[in-house]
UniProtKB/Swiss-Prot annotation:
Disulfide bond entries: none
PANTHER family per record: UREASE (PTHR33569:SF1)
Pathway field: Nitrogen metabolism; urea degradation; CO(2) and NH(3) from urea (urease route): step 1/1
UniProtKB keywords: Cytoplasm, Hydrolase
Protein name from the UniProt record: Urease subunit gamma
Its EC number(s): 3.5.1.5
Enzyme class, first EC level, given as a word: hydrolase
Length: 100
């Protein structure tokens, strides 16, 4: 199977998000890479489902709460930008203050 660099990046994000989901389900607080991966994957999947950029900008702020992440992680992520594939093409989704 041949994958493009972009497809490899998507799989890496998905794998990291899956690990983050499992750790969160076990009651562990997420670190920086896990938090970013989980929010990014939610945005990418929402785009694939056909949601709008505006919907995903809002949804990105509801994926994690401060209680879900280690101390200081929320402050380390002032925004997340995701280049997501929508049914009508690729668009940039920016989520400001994703962890509140």
């Amino acid at each position: 199977m041949e994958l493009t660099p972009r497809e490899k990046d998507k799989l890496l994000i998905f794998t990291a998000a899956l690990l983050a989901e499992r750790r969160r389900a076990r009651g562990l607080k997420l670190n920086y890479p896990e938090a970013v991966a989980l929010i990014t994957a939610a945005i990418m999947e929402g785009a694939r489902d056909g949601r709008t950029v505006a919907e995903l900008m809002h949804e990105g702020t509801t994926v994690l709460a401060r209680e879900d992440v280690m101390d200081g992680v929320a402050e380390m992520i002032p925004e997340i930008q995701v280049e997501a594939t929508f049914p009508d093409g690729t668009k940039l989704v920016t989520v400001h203050h994703p962890i509140v």
